[in-house]
UniProtKB/Swiss-Prot annotation:
GO terms for biological process: establishment of mitotic sister chromatid cohesion; mitotic sister chromatid cohesion; mitotic sister chromatid cohesion, centromeric; N-terminal protein amino acid acetylation; somitogenesis. This is N-alpha-acetyltransferase 50. The active site is at Y72, H111. Belongs to the acetyltransferase family. GNAT subfamily. Substrate binds at Y30, M74. CoA binds at N116, E117, S118, A119, I120, D121, F122, Y123, Q124, K125. Interacts with naa35. Gene3D superfamilies: 3.40.630.30. It comes from Danio rerio (Zebrafish). Keywords: Acyltransferase, Cytoplasm, Developmental protein, Nucleus, Transferase. Residues 137-140 are annotated as: Substrate.
Length: 168
């Protein structure tokens, strides 16, 4: 299947499309606050189009936890018939490029259901590592446990941004 993959903004006009995609793709449902917040994150939320058909989406938020600036991937998914066509790669690269351009993120992370081997493989190809497993992370789905996958965006020897010493 040859096709054109494009990313587009999430707007009040197409947020229902995002909602429908998420309902089909993910085993968990997201509340209205999730969608309200998604409209505020700008480039961190994108719909993915395959030949002008909305087939997937990525939604992230900035998270300040563990004394770090982290990017959290809330959702990244694509309808089953359109998988393995490079759409997920395009969405993840979009997010990684934002982090790279910004230059102040310590890492990027997400939760993946422990049984979702294809997602785990996908993220590991991009240098994500399983850093912990959260018991009973999900409600009402089995298995309820989630792996936390994380990709470090700084070399361990680099000082955190804003702490670079100025030469006199």
């Amino acid at each position: 299947m040859k096709g054109r993959i494009e990313l587009g903004d999430v707007t009040p006009h197409n947020i229902k499309q995002l909602k429908r995609l998420n309902q089909v793709i993910f085993p968990v449902s997201y509340n209205d606050k999730f969608y309200k917040d998604v409209l505020e994150v700008g480039e961190l939320a994108k719909l993915a189009y395959f030949n002008d058909i909305a087939v997937g989406a990525v939604c992230c938020r900035v998270d300040h936890s563990q004394n770090q600036k982290r990017l959290y991937i809330m959702t990244l998914g694509c309808l089953a018939p359109y998988r393995r066509l490079g759409i997920g790669t395009k969405m993840l690269n979009h997010v990684l490029n934002i982090c790279e351009k910004d230059g102040t993120f310590d890492n990027i992370y997400l939760h993946v259901q422990i049984s979702n081997e294809s997602a785990i493989d996908f993220y590991q190809k991009f240098g994500f590592e399983i850093i912990e497993t959260k018991k009973n992370y999900y409600k009402r789905i089995e298995p309820a446990d989630a792996h936390v996958l994380q990709k470090s965006l700084r070399s361990p020897c680099a000082p955190p941004a804003g702490e670079l010493q100025k030469a006199d």
